[in-house]
Amino acid sequence: SGFHLSFSFFRRAVCGIRPTLSGFIVGGTVAPINSWPWQAKLRIAGNFLCGGSLIQPEWVLTAAHCVEGESPSIIKVTLGAHYLSTAQVVGTEQYFDVVQIIQHENYKMPKRFSNDVALLKLSRPAALRNGVGLVCLSDDQFQRPFNGTSCWTTGWGRLSWPGPVAKELMQVDLPLVSPQNCLSSYPNGYDPNTMICAGRSQGGTGACRGDSGGPLVCEFKGKWYLEGVTSWGQLPCDLPNKPTVYADVRKLKSWITGKISRSPALKVATNCSSVLNNTLKSPGYPDSYPINMFCVYRVPIPCDTELVIHFNSFHLENHVFCWYDRLRITDGSNRVIGTYCGQQTGRSVLVNDTVAVLTFKTDRSLNSSGFHLSFSFFPRGNATLLPFTTPTQTTTQRPTTTPTPGCGVVQNNTLRSPGYPSNYPRNTHCVYRVF
């Protein structure tokens, strides 16, 4: 019968490369946009939590004290970001759920912040492109610059103590401090086996509250290496002879690489359904879908064609952030088009790329009837989105449905919000791409 092959192309993962440039950052400057491509931003329940560093396409390294006792389902990771606020974007952002937290088993032993590292496994590999890249792990072949050569730390932490957090990513260059001097500064808290220090003896610069988990990087032979993970320091954050203390990545490298190599790959469930006749139904539909599902569906889109996904029926466990059960739609570049849960029957979603990737994930508790989707292909620029009916309820009358337009498309170089000039509907997520 011969063979049927498919070809996928991926950029080779190269670490430590940043653009050529002409916890808490005190006394630093605003970083040029996308100048530190491994910088991660962690949020919990919608609020900024900590920084982190992308060390593998699926792995972010952060501080253990940032995620201690937290569930992976409530932590969100953003890569390629510059602004602290999620309302301000630069266009290179990639958004991720966390599926696993691996905290160092000896965190807080023997000192309070010993072994202050944790690994976050992302829900999918990051796309290594504009503004998103890997940092190299510290390498023993390079001698550390304890002679005063500066390294750099970055973050959205406080600009002073007490003081506000940064609205944009900040950077500051700091010299590494020898273990002897660090021990002199912190005779009771410093652990030379798991910590490294950086800062100026005169003070005035350093990391602060909100920078925790972020990177301390040094350049060797044209590449940037992660030497430290921002951990702790003395308040206020800019005291003389009180450097910032970081988890020592070089000392902890074997733990980091060992945990990553032993972590099982995210497995796709064997009982996932299939796309048949341009239709996709969740496993078990119309009965309840199983718990603990992880299914990935790839829908190729022919050249000069765009895809409309119509939600004929859609009922998943609801949550304001879709933390529990969800369907996520991304394009071929890992750009998130939308994340959906709750009741979404009647919605239409436009995908204008070479492929649509649908990821269906469920948790271990409540479930619902699932979804029934249909796929329609149109010549590029000619897609029609069906109206999306949003249920509304009042306490005085029977629930009614109010038709509102779908997301629509750009036509004649014009784009109108759904419902314009009337009010746009609530709980709407629209993505428009202008080529």
Curated annotation (Swiss-Prot):
Keyword Secreted annotated: yes
Tissues and organs where the protein is expressed, per its UniProt entry: Component of the acid-insoluble organic matrix of the aragonitic skeleton (at protein level).
Annotated signal sequence range: 1-16
Every CUB domain range: 256-378
MF (Gene Ontology): serine-type endopeptidase activity
CDD domains on file: CUB, Tryp_SPc
Annotated InterPro entries: CUB_dom (IPR000859), Peptidase_S1_PA (IPR009003), Peptidase_S1_PA_chymotrypsin (IPR043504), Peptidase_S1A (IPR001314), Sperma_CUB_dom_sf (IPR035914), Trypsin_dom (IPR001254), TRYPSIN_HIS (IPR018114), TRYPSIN_SER (IPR033116)
Membrane-spanning parts: none
Main location as per UniProt: secreted
Catalytic center residues: 65, 116, 212
Any Gene Ontology CC annotation: extracellular region
SS bond list: 50-66, 151-218, 182-197, 208-237, 322-341
UniProt keyword Protease present: yes
Alphabetical UniProt keywords: Disulfide bond, Hydrolase, Protease, Secreted, Serine protease, Signal
Compartments (UniProt record): Secreted
Stated family: Belongs to the peptidase S1 family.
Protein name: CUB and peptidase domain-containing protein 1
Lineage: Eukaryota, Metazoa, Cnidaria, Anthozoa, Hexacorallia
